[in-house]
Amino acid sequence: ITGVVLVRNEQYHLQKPFIEQVIFKYYPSSAAAFDAFHAGEVAGISQVTKDILPQALAEPNLSIYTNRLPQMGFVLLNLNNPEVPFLQETKLRRALMLGLNRQRLIDAFMQGQAIPLDGPILPGSWAHYEGVEKIPYDADMAIALLKELGYTLPADGGAVRVNKDGKPLAFSLVHPDDAVHTQMAQSIQANWAAIGVQVNLISVPYASLQNDYLAKRAYQAALVELALPRTPDPDPYPFWHQAEATGLAQNYSQWDNRPASEYLEQARVTTDFGLRARLYRNFQVIFARELPSLPLYVSVYTYGVNVTVQG
């Protein structure tokens, strides 16, 4: 199949549509689709991927639009792994968040095709709370928090902070083995090294990350993208409710917070739209305070339409 043609229904009982037909043409790649646009064969490109983005932005006859994808980048932290008990410390998780340069991840490795994420509900959703705390990149503040927690640099001049018992502040970060996620993981590793935290990287195929690490809770930290249902209802219950922390459920961080779970439970059953929004707001406030995992970015979807197309 190389395309689909939709024609106007002349028997439609209301006003006749103004457009006589719409033609969808299929191409083997985004580059081929862009060439077709340049040749005047099509009036738009359904997806402007990163490889053709520079050319698309430079094309004067192509208007570029973006929208958020229901896909969120996170560093998941395993809060119930006895190998890394320090991840249970809220202030330490906050220090890790402060030490993350999320904008660099977006600019350097995603060509700007994402926006920073500050919580577990997509920006733009009716359930998103705009007033949620937005934690900046502040390495100095991160270091101050670590010092407050008793993590200091060793007297011999080492670069990794240790606690009062001399144990290093170190953990592993498992990540997908594709080029983009590998570069992101290396950038995160460098960010945290700058505040005295040692991160050992583990590169695996995404299927292995899901099945061998997340599902089995056999990890310390993981760089992931959480895919949400393509519906107007955000329902963060599967990823963050305490009942989903074990078995094959998806609360991979094993976050066990009863007040947050109660808000999610109530939001699932009430039909009062305003009440649901307030319940999700309260949930997001707790999430921002506790930071059971570290939100990074929301991917965006980019497409292009000929400037002559109206409406």
Regions found by a protein language model. Give the residues of each.
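Bilobed "Venus flytrap"/periplasmic-binding protein-like clamshell domains
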Residues: 1-13, 28, 103, 139-143, ...
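Short, well-ordered beta-strand elements
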Residues: 3-5, 20-26, 44, 168-177, ...
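Ligand-site clamp/hinge motif
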Residues: 9-55, 189, 196-200
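Immediate post-signal peptide segment of exported/extracytoplasmic ligand-binding proteins
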Residues: 16-20, 90, 136-172
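Short helices/loops that flank or line small-molecule/ion binding pockets
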Residues: 31-41, 58-59, 91, 186-195, ...
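A ligand-binding cleft/hinge motif common to bilobed small-molecule-binding domains
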Residues: 48-59, 228-233
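Detector for C-terminal structural segments
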Residues: 66-68, 72-73, 99-133, 138-141, ...
